[in-house]
Regions:
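Conserved glycine-rich cofactor-binding loop
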Residues: 8, 15-17
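Residue(s) in the substrate-gating loop at a strand-loop-helix junction
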Residues: 142
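Conserved NAD(P)H cofactor-binding loop of Rossmann-fold oxidoreductase domains
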Residues: 90-95
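Active-site helix of classical SDR
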Residues: 122, 158
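Active-site-adjacent segment of SDR/Rossmann-fold oxidoreductases
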Residues: 147, 168-179
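Substrate-binding pocket helix/loop in short-chain dehydrogenase/reductase
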Residues: 98-99, 103-109
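Conserved glycine-rich Rossmann-like NAD(P)H-binding loop of the short-chain dehydrogenase/reductase
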Residues: 29-46
Length: 187
C-alpha cells in the first residue's frame, strides 16, 4: 500500500522534467495530481495520459513567475473544492552569465519564481495542512545551493534560499504532523 494513495498532490512546473516525472510516478502510486505550469497543451496531454491509466488529474494553467500568481492559483484550486495534502514546489529556472549581463526584469522574474512564489505557496497551504491534521511539502532546490557558483550567482543563491527555508519550516511545523523537505537534484 502506497502512502500516496488517495492523496491530493499539487505539483508546480508539472509540464516537463522533474515535475512531469513526479506526476507520472505519483499517479502510479495512487495519488490524485493537481498539475500547474505555463504550458497548457503539455499539461492537458499529461492529464489525459494520467486519466487514460485510470488516475485522477486536474489542470491549472498559471505563470508562477508573475507576482500574485501563487494566490491566484490557490484561489483557483479552492474554487474547485480541492484540498492539497502534499505541495511540491518544483517550478523554477536559472540563467547563466555574469550578474551585470542580466536586465533587472530577467533576474526579478527568476527570483519571483524560485523564491517568492515558492514561499507564498507554502504560506498559503501550511494553515490548510495544519487544519487537516498534517501534510507534506517538497521544495525542489538544487545541488547548486551548496556552494556559490560563478556565472550562476542569482540561481545558486535562490536555491540556497530554498534549502535554508525548507529546513527552517521543517523545524517549525514538525510537531504539527507536516513533513517538509528540500530535494536537491543535480551534480
Amino acid at each position: 500500500m502506497s502512502i500516496y494513495k488517495d492523496k491530493k498532490v499539487l505539483i508546480t512546473g508539472a509540464s516537463t522534467g522533474i515535475g512531469y516525472a513526479l506526476a507520472e510516478e505519483l499517479n502510479k502510486r495512487g495519488a490524485e495530481v493537481i498539475l500547474t505550469a505555463r504550458s497548457e497543451d503539455k499539461l492537458h496531454a499529461l492529464a489525459e495520459k494520467i486519466k487514460a491509466s485510470g488516475g485522477k488529474a486536474h489542470v491549472f494553467v498559471e505563470d508562477l513567475s508573475i507576482q500574485g500568481s501563487a494566490e491566484a492559483l490557490y484561489n483557483q484550486i479552492k474554487s474547485q473544492n480541492l484540498s492539497v495534502d502534499i505541495l511540491i514546489n518544483n517550478a523554477g529556472y536559472g540563467r547563466w552569465g555574469e550578474l551585470t549581463s542580466f536586465e533587472r526584469d530577467d533576474y526579478a522574474e527568476m527570483l519571483q519564481l524560485n523564491v517568492v512564489t515558492l514561499t507564498d505557496l507554502c504560506h498559503l497551504y501550511l494553515p490548510d495542512m495544519v487544519k487537516q491534521g498534517g501534510g507534506g511539502i517538497i521544495n525542489v532546490g538544487s545541488m547548486a545551493s551548496l556552494a556559490p557558483i560563478p556565472y550562476a550567482s542569482i540561481y545558486s543563491s535562490s536555491k540556497a534560499y530554498v534549502l535554508m527555508f525548507s529546513e527552517a519550516i521543517r523545524f517549525e511545523y514538525q510537531d504539527k504532523n507536516i513533513k517538509v523537505m528540500a530535494l536537491l537534484p543535480g551534480g
